[in-house]
C-alpha cells in the first residue's frame, strides 16, 4: 500500500491519501504511457484537494435521488452543493466499462479525498484515451472579438450630452415579430439615455429605368427626452363604428329615427 501525500490549501494540515492498491503507478501504467503518468497524478492530486467539498455528511436529510441515467457515472455517486449543504446521489448500479473495472472498484471502496483523487484519475485516463486535453487550465478559450467586437468603446454610439462612447444599447420594449423593438442607448458616464441614430433615405423613382436610388446618411443623434411609450390603444368598438346596431328589450321604447 502506497501513501500519497498532497498539500491541502489549509496552511496547517496535510491530507494523507492511502490508495488501496499495491502501486498506483503500476495500475495507471496499464492505461497511459510513462510520459503522461506523472503529470496525470500531479494534476489529480491538485484538483482533488482543491475542489473536494468537506463538512457535508451524506445523511437521509440532505440526499436527493436524481432522475437521470447513471450508466456512465460509476464512481460519481454524490454531486455536492456547498452552498445549500446538500448532496445529490446517483445510483452506480452499472459498471462504466470492464476496461476500468479495477479502478472503478477502488473508487467504490474508498471515500473522502481518496475517492476524489481516483475519480480525477479515471477522468484523465479517459481523456488521454480519446486524445483530448484533461486539464481545463490548459484549454484556451476561443476569442470572437474579431467577429463580434461589440464591447469595444470605440465602436459604441457617442452620447450627445457628454460625447462619451461609454454607452450601452438596451432593448426597452419588444413588439411583434414583424415590428422593430424599442431600443435606447444609456450612457454610463452622465447617466442619460438617448435614441439610437437612424438612416434617412431619399428615394428617387425613375419610371423609365425602374431603378431606385437611395442616399442614406446618419441623422443627428438626439437625446431621448420623451416619456415612455404608451400602451397599445384599445381596439375600436363595433357599436361605435356603426357595424353592429344596439339591441333593445321589447319593453323599452323604440329608438327615434334620425332625421
Curated annotation (Swiss-Prot):
Q: Mostly located where?
A: virion
Q: Where is this region: Disordered?
A: 220-259
Q: What is its EC number?
A: 2.7.7.6
Record keyword Transferase present? yes
* Root EC class: transferase
Instruction: Point out which parts of the chain are TFIIS-type zinc fingers, as ranges.
Output: 155-195
Q: Which reaction does it catalyse?
A: RNA(n) + a ribonucleoside 5'-triphosphate = RNA(n+1) + diphosphate
A biological process from GO: DNA-templated transcription
What Pfam family is a match, any one?
Answer: rpo30_N
Record-linked InterPro entries: RNA_pol_30_chordopoxvir-type, RNA_pol_30_chordopoxvir-type_N, Znf_TFIIS
UniProt: Zn(2+) binding residues:
159, 162, 187, 190
SMART domains in the record, alphabetically?
ZnF_C2C2 (SM00440)
GO MF annotation: an example: zinc ion binding
Q: What induces it?
A: Expressed in the early phase of the viral replicative cycle.
Q: Which Gene3D superfamilies match?
A: 2.20.25.10
- Compositional bias (Pro residues): 226-236
Keyword Phosphoprotein assigned: no
According to its UniProt entry, the function of this protein is described as:
Part of the DNA-dependent RNA polymerase which catalyzes the transcription of viral DNA into RNA using the four ribonucleoside triphosphates as substrates. Responsible for the transcription of early, intermediate and late genes. DNA-dependent RNA polymerase associates with the early transcription factor (ETF), itself composed of OPG118 and OPG134, thereby allowing the early genes transcription. Late transcription, and probably also intermediate transcription, require newly synthesized RNA polymerase.
Fill in the subunit field for this protein: The DNA-dependent RNA polymerase (vRNAP) consists of eight subunits encoded by early viral genes and termed according to their apparent molecular masses Rpo147, Rpo132, Rpo35, Rpo30, Rpo22, Rpo19, Rpo18, and Rpo7. The same holoenzyme, with the addition of the transcription-specificity factor RAP94, is used for early gene expression.
The similarity comment for this entry is: Belongs to the poxviridae DNA-directed RNA polymerase 30 kDa subunit family.
List the protein's name.
DNA-directed RNA polymerase 30 kDa polypeptide
Amino acid at each position: 500500500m502506497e501513501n500519497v501525500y498532497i498539500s491541502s490549501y489549509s496552511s496547517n494540515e496535510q491530507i494523507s491519501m492511502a490508495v488501496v492498491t499495491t502501486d498506483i503507478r503500476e495500475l495507471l501504467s496499464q492505461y497511459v504511457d510513462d510520459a503522461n503518468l506523472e503529470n496525470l497524478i500531479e494534476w489529480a492530486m491538485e484538483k482533488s484537494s482543491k475542489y473536494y467539498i468537506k463538512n457535508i455528511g451524506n445523511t437521509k436529510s440532505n440526499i436527493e435521488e436524481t432522475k437521470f441515467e447513471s450508466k456512465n457515472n460509476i464512481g460519481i455517486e454524490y454531486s455536492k452543493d456547498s452552498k445549500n449543504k446538500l448532496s445529490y446521489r446517483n445510483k452506480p448500479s452499472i459498471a462504466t466499462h470492464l476496461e476500468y473495472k479495477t479502478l472503478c472498484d477502488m473508487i467504490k471502496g474508498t471515500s473522502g479525498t481518496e475517492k476524489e483523487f481516483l475519480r480525477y484519475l479515471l477522468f484523465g485516463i479517459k481523456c488521454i484515451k480519446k486524445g483530448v486535453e484533461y486539464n481545463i487550465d490548459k484549454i484556451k478559450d476561443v476569442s470572437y472579438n474579431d467577429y463580434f467586437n461589440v464591447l469595444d468603446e470605440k465602436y459604441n454610439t457617442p452620447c450627445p450630452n457628454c460625447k462619451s462612447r461609454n454607452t450601452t444599447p438596451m432593448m426597452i420594449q419588444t413588439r411583434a415579430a414583424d415590428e422593430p423593438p424599442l431600443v435606447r442607448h444609456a450612457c454610463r458616464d452622465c447617466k442619460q439615455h438617448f435614441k439610437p441614430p437612424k438612416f434617412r433615405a431619399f428615394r428617387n423613382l425613375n419610371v423609365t429605368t425602374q431603378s431606385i436610388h437611395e442616399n442614406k446618411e446618419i441623422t443627428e443623434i438626439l437625446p431621448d427626452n420623451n416619456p415612455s411609450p404608451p400602451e397599445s390603444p384599445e381596439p375600436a368598438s363595433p357599436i361605435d363604428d356603426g357595424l353592429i346596431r344596439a339591441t333593445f328589450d321589447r319593453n323599452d321604447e323604440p329608438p327615434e329615427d334620425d332625421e
